[in-house]
Amino acid sequence: MDAEQEQVMYPRILFEQMAQFRGKKVTVVGNVCNEDQNDSLVIEFGPTGLNQHVVIDNYRRVDLNNTTKFVEIRGVVLNQNIVSCEELTEFEQKDPFDFDTYSKLIHLSQSDKLSSLFTDQ
């Protein structure tokens, strides 16, 4: 595979990993909270009540009047609380997202022992 065909990786990360991925492409998931005064999207990036909110800049607008939205964002981490969006995928959310299970899966996918199960390499 040559450099032009190489697929760009957007590793899934957790809120506590944001600082170590500054300037890098990542995938984050969360519940849409609102749009702030700067037309940025605010998502809850972890279990409710932990105040793990991330601002998503440079995104296409989400219909917040529709059903509660769950989103997956691919973009670049600008700092501990801001991701510049390159791609946004919306999901209708009927049940609360299980961030505890998701967190365990992310830790497994990043472990030396099991990471090969989660990549094509």
Curated annotation (Swiss-Prot):
SUPFAM superfamilies (alphabetical): Nucleic acid-binding proteins (SSF50249)
Keyword Magnesium: no
One Gene Ontology CC term in the entry: telomerase holoenzyme complex
Highest taxon listed in the record's lineage: Eukaryota
UniProt-annotated location(s): Nucleus; Chromosome, Telomere
Keywords for this protein: Chromosome, Nucleus, Telomere
MF terms (GO), sorted A to Z: DNA binding
Main subcellular location of this protein, as a coarse class: nucleus
Single GO BP term: DNA recombination
InterPro entries membership: NA-bd_OB-fold, Rfa2
Role this protein plays: Component of the heterotrimeric replication protein A (RPA) and holoenzyme telomerase ribonucleoprotein complexes. As part of the heterotrimeric RPA complex, binds and stabilizes single-stranded DNA intermediates that form during DNA replication or upon DNA stress. It prevents their reannealing and in parallel, recruits and activates different proteins and complexes involved in DNA metabolism. Thereby, it plays an essential role both in DNA replication and the cellular response to DNA damage.
Similarity comment: Belongs to the replication factor A protein 3 family.
Oligomeric and partner information: Component of the replication protein A complex (RPA), a heterotrimeric complex composed of RPA1, RPA2/TEB2 and RPA3/TEB3. Component of the telomerase holoenzyme complex, composed of the catalytic core (the catalytic subunit TERT, the telomerase RNA template component TER and TAP65/p65), which is associated with two heterotrimeric subcomplexes: (i) the replication protein A (RPA)-related subcomplex, composed of TEB1, RPA2/TEB2 and RPA3/TEB3 and (ii) the CST-like subcomplex, composed of TAP75/p75, TAP45/p45 and TAP19/p19.
The protein, known as: Replication protein A 14 kDa subunit
Protein species of origin: Tetrahymena thermophila (strain SB210)
Gene: RPA2
